[in-house]
């Protein structure tokens, strides 16, 4: 029994200095300014290589979608419906990618509910689309139309466009638009 106590005491005597010496204030961690510079570099890389290109692709695809939808309005053909559906899928893809980092203007100006509100207010959208006076005002004045501000989130954006050009996941028949 004495041998066990002696061995235990000896091990503790050897371990204690090791434990005490390993607890140093100098752990070679970078200082605040080094960490700040590293964080800034990481953020800049993410913004420049992910955020900006994704938002640019979203903007470009959305402009293409708007153009194709304008073509569809002027020349309602099945080919133009199909083109609009293809452009909608492309633009929607970039929106979905961008939701990972709603950053900058997307968060500052609360863009999400304007273009991605759910659920779609289907019955109200049907009423709106059948209101000839409102549609005429929107045609004439565009986004600056007084009636535009009364639409509300559930009648705007991707889901509203989807409702107009798709049915059951397929391009809608042009005769139904």
Question: Language-model segments: which ranges?
Answer:
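Mature extracytoplasmic or organellar-lumen-exposed domains after removal of signal/transit peptides
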Residues: 30-177
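Bacterial N-terminal signal peptides that target proteins for export
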Residues: 2-11
């Amino acid at each position: 029994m004495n041998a066990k106590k002696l061995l235990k005491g000896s091990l503790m005597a050897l371990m204690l200095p090791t434990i005490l010496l390993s607890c140093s204030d100098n752990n070679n961690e970078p200082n605040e300014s080094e960490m700040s510079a590293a964080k800034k570099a990481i953020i800049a890389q993410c913004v420049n290589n992910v955020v900006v290109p994704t938002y640019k692709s979203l903007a470009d695809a959305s402009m293409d979608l708007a153009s194709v939808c304008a073509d569809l309005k002027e020349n309602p053909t099945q080919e133009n419906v199909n083109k609009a559906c293809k452009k909608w899928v492309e633009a929607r893809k970039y929106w979905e990618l961008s939701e990972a980092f709603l950053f900058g203007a997307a968060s500052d100006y609360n863009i999400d509910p304007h273009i991605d509100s759910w659920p779609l207010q289907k019955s109200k959208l049907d009423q709106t689309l059948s209101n000839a006076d409102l549609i005429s005002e929107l045609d004439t004045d565009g986004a600056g139309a007084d009636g535009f501000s009364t639409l509300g989130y559930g009648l705007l954006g991707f889901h509203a466009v989807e409702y107009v050009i798709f049915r059951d996941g397929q391009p809608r028949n042009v005769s139904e638009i």
